[in-house]
């Protein structure tokens, strides 16, 4: 058996499999990528033990825990842990602080003939390590912010750069009012943990300059960490440009064709299309006040007609109508205003090929 470990850096850099022995309610609030929740106690059992601890102390709480998790319940849980240990011989287990729960799991596994290491300090210590990692990256590394009108393909650029940090990808959201995906977003703590691990791995690969997309503080329901967002407000910018026609086609691809396919993959043909249509109309409704009543109604009618035609024949051509209107009358004026206020920070502007070449050259020079 490997020794119990407090080398959190190695655990995250190597994507070491980990078993989380906390209760499901704790796990749902935040965990680490790829970790499996195999709790010692379920939520109700944990609550009872916690109440007992407050009223009668630790010894009574431990005794109650053993009474609640015994017999067949205990056997089923131990068997699940054994299966995990056999499937992941290089893995570790942890609880919240690396205390009684993970020690109990470790001891019961040993009683069953399985030696398995635990993470010293548990979830809390690993979470603190990742928050420190995030702080150090923001403090010590340089950042370049990639801006551009809606539909210029900023994410396409980021995916081609080894030093990019894709905040929208980590948040599973495209960042705009239309940015929700067919699958949900991570919890805030999960978002922060994934971001910190991404930064940790890139720095371990020698990357000290990062390219991030120009985002508001909120990417859907995920908050960009305050110190990172504040740092982004003063960083140099690169502005991505493309023709209006290309941008319309890209938005059609991303927000209609691909999003519809996502919903159908997740929910099936009939329900998937209905949920896709509902999501698109709701996204437009979210900016009703900013569009104004007349413009919202006009774009909504165009969108509804396009959705009906798509459902009837599979054709998506009519969607270009509302996309062109939304870009020309809403997003483009808004982004033009933002660019004017950020002009002093923009050190380069160009199309995808030019911007990629510039950012790659810039990363090699710094």
From Swiss-Prot:
Keyword Amino-acid biosynthesis belongs to the record: no
UniProt keyword Transferase present: yes
CDD domains: RHOD_YbbB (cd01520)
Residues the record marks as active site: 95 (s-selanylcysteine intermediate)
GO process annotations (BP): tRNA wobble uridine modification
The enzyme's E.C. designation: 2.9.1.3
Residues annotated as domain Rhodanese: 12-135
GO molecular function, one term: transferase activity, transferring alkyl or aryl (other than methyl) groups
Coiled-coil positions: none
Swiss-Prot/TrEMBL keywords: Selenium, Transferase
Superkingdom of the organism of origin: Bacteria
Annotated family: Belongs to the SelU family.
Function statement: Involved in the post-transcriptional modification of the uridine at the wobble position (U34) of tRNA(Lys), tRNA(Glu) and tRNA(Gln). Catalyzes the conversion of 2-thiouridine (S2U-RNA) to 2-selenouridine (Se2U-RNA). Acts in a two-step process involving geranylation of 2-thiouridine (S2U) to S-geranyl-2-thiouridine (geS2U) and subsequent selenation of the latter derivative to 2-selenouridine (Se2U) in the tRNA chain.
Subunit architecture: Monomer.
Protein name, UniProt field: tRNA 2-selenouridine synthase
Lineage, opening ranks: Bacteria, Pseudomonadati, Pseudomonadota, Gammaproteobacteria, Pseudomonadales
């Amino acid at each position: 058996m490997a020794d119990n470990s407090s080398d959190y850096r190695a655990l995250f850099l190597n994507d070491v499999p980990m078993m989380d022995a906390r209760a499901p309610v704790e796990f749902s609030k935040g965990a680490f990528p790829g970790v499996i929740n195999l709790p010692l106690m379920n939520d109700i059992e944990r609550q009872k033990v916690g109440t007992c601890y407050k009223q009668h102390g630790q010894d009574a709480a431990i005794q109650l825990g053993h009474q609640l998790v015994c017999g067949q319940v205990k056997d089923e849980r131990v068997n699940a842990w054994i299966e995990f240990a056999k499937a992941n011989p290089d893995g570790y287990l942890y609880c919240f602080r690396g205390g009684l729960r993970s020690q109990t799991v470790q001891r019961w596994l040993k009683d069953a003939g399985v030696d398995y290491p635990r993470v010293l300090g548990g979830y809390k210590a690993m979470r603190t390590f990742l928050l420190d990692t995030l702080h150090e990256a923001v403090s010590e590394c340089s950042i370049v912010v990639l801006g551009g009108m809606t539909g210029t393909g900023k994410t396409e650029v980021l995916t081609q750069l080894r030093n990019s940090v894709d905040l929208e990808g980590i948040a599973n959201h495209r960042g705009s009012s239309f940015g929700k995906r067919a699958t949900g977003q991570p919890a805030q703590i999960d978002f922060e943990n994934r971001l910190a691990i991404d930064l940790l791995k890139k720095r371990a690969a020698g990357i000290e300059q990062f390219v991030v997309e120009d985002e508001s503080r909120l990417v859907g329901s995920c908050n960009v960490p305050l110190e990172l967002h504040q740092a982004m407000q003063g960083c140099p910018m690169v502005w991505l440009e493309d023709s209006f026609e290309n941008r319309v086609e890209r938005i059609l691809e991303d927000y209609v064709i691909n999003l519809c396919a996502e919903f159908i993959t997740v929910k099936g043909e009939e329900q998937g299309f209905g949920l896709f249509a509902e999501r698109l109309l709701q996204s437009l409704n979210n900016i009703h006040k900013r569009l104004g009543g007349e413009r919202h109604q006009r774009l909504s009618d165009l969108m509804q007609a396009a959705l009906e035609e798509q459902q009837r024949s599979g054709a998506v051509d009519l969607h270009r109508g509302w996309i062109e209107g939304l870009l020309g009358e809403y997003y483009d004026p808004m982004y033009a205003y933002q660019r004017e206020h950020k002009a002093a920070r923009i050190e380069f502007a160009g199309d995808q090929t030019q911007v990629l070449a510039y950012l790659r050259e810039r990363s090699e020079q710094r």
